[in-house]
Amino acid sequence: MVALADYPQIAAGKVRQLHAVDDEHLLLVASDRISAFDHVLSTPIPDKGRVLTAMSVFWFNLLSDVVPNHLVAWDDPRIPAEVRGRALLVRRLEMLQVECVARGYLTGSGLLDYQRTGAVCGVVLPEGLTEASRLPEPIFTPATKAELGAHDENVSFEAVAEAVGQELAAELRELTLRVYGRAAEHARERGVILADTKFEFGVAGGGALVLGDEVLTPDSSRYWPADGYEPGKVQPSFDKQYVRNWLTSAESGWDRASDTPPPPLPDDVVAATRARYVEAYERITGLDLADWPSPAA
């Protein structure tokens, strides 16, 4: 029986690690780790790795008629039993060093850019927009892929074109917005707003663009409950915002500006964060996380 130790680890991020399987395949393993403010917290969130993996599989399958993806299998003899349910067997790709972000609503770093300049990544927006405003149409707001521990930096479309070429940049923009549009439509049908999301693309043999990494998970996307949507204020969300809020509260006792690592998360914050991740999966997919993984998934 194969073990994870049989596969050399070739990369590790805050949440995932990548192992070499053979010349054509990699094993992408999601952990229960959670990061905030560029720190990996010492307290894991139970089942988070399963949610990220199951949700990626759901979206890869749903979007397969829109864009090819790197998923080979989620249930395969080459996947060690110790990571089954939170690991994907994927194709090797030549990944592009561009974070392809689509935004349908104004929040986060996009809102900060807009407040400073009236634009996001060079895309000029109407006056009078506020927190959580729905944009007239979704926009492509790319970012550079930062090294571990550093911040991604929002850049203009022109900067992407300079880095990868005008034709490929235009293809990335068109594909990003097309995938976002399909995903946002599905989420809306499930009573959820997909405010924004990040995609990563790679190039396969022949030069075709392929969707890689994770896709449309609570770690890479902002999901809001549609029934409580109210522009002008911060929206409740199905992601790690609850953790961020606790870390910046007086209760945590942590000074974000200090060099000290964040404190361990209390049990109630862990439970509430887990519940948000699980709810995101179950609302979006209509499936029960308790059934993942199963041969019928």
From Swiss-Prot:
Annotated family: Belongs to the SAICAR synthetase family.
Taxonomic superkingdom: Bacteria
Keyword annotations: ATP-binding, Ligase, Nucleotide-binding, Purine biosynthesis
Biological process annotations from GO: 'de novo' IMP biosynthetic process
Classification lineage: Bacteria, Bacillati, Actinomycetota, Actinomycetes, Pseudonocardiales
GO molecular function terms listed in the Swiss-Prot or TrEMBL record: ATP binding; phosphoribosylaminoimidazolesuccinocarboxamide synthase activity
PANTHER family on file: PHOSPHORIBOSYLAMINOIMIDAZOLE-SUCCINOCARBOXAMIDE SYNTHASE
Pathway the protein takes part in: Purine metabolism; IMP biosynthesis via de novo pathway; 5-amino-1-(5-phospho-D-ribosyl)imidazole-4-carboxamide from 5-amino-1-(5-phospho-D-ribosyl)imidazole-4-carboxylate: step 1/2
PROSITE patterns, sorted: SAICAR_SYNTHETASE_2
Assigned GO CC terms: cytoplasm
EC class of the enzyme, as a word: ligase
InterPro entries: SAICAR_synt/ADE2_N, SAICAR_synth, SAICAR_synthetase_CS
Alphabetized HAMAP family for the sequence: SAICAR_synth (MF_00137)
Database matches in NCBIfam families: PRK13961.1, purC
The reaction(s) this protein catalyses: 5-amino-1-(5-phospho-D-ribosyl)imidazole-4-carboxylate + L-aspartate + ATP = (2S)-2-[5-amino-1-(5-phospho-beta-D-ribosyl)imidazole-4-carboxamido]succinate + ADP + phosphate + 2 H(+)
Protein name (record): Phosphoribosylaminoimidazole-succinocarboxamide synthase
Gene: purC
EC number per UniProt: 6.3.2.6
